[in-house]
Amino acid sequence: MTTPAGGWESVPGLADVKEAHGETTLVVEPENLIDAAMYLRDELGFGFLSDVTAVDYLGWPDKGVSGFIGTPGGRDINRPMTQGHQALPAAKPKRFAMNYHLLAIADRPQRVRLQTWMEDGEPVPSVVPVWPTADWHEREAYDMVGIQIDGHPNLVRILMDDDWEGHPLRKDYPLGGEPVRFSGEE
């Protein structure tokens, strides 16, 4: 990815810049999200929000996550050429992450991910005033993961029934259900 003139350091409230697999992630605190989003849109040309994702990192790195299937000692059975030894994934700063996938298409097409972290119940501001396409994405993050989004114009469930209890994509969501009778069963 092409770094803008002057580097990413000009993004307001920037806490960290991560480069992995040719992708750039800009990490900001929730209170700096809107300023960073407006700067990326207005000054750096990231006018297109392609996706918003919410991720629950409960239990990281204790569980097999993101291809890591191993033990606390670092043995990963997915890496036979390295005798199954790999460093443990880095601890995450908080339980939940919101990722905003942005695209600049005007002069030189490029992508960047804007990321913010929060604990359970800690709100994140809505980016709908910056990118109106975030509307349904943020509703999905609320509905499926339980992210509290301040200032959203219509924060109601979008996928689950209105009377559904809980948020199904959370790692602590109870598994199980009710038995279902299929036709032909006695």
Model-identified regions with their sequence ranges:
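Terminal low-complexity/charged segments
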Residues: 1-186
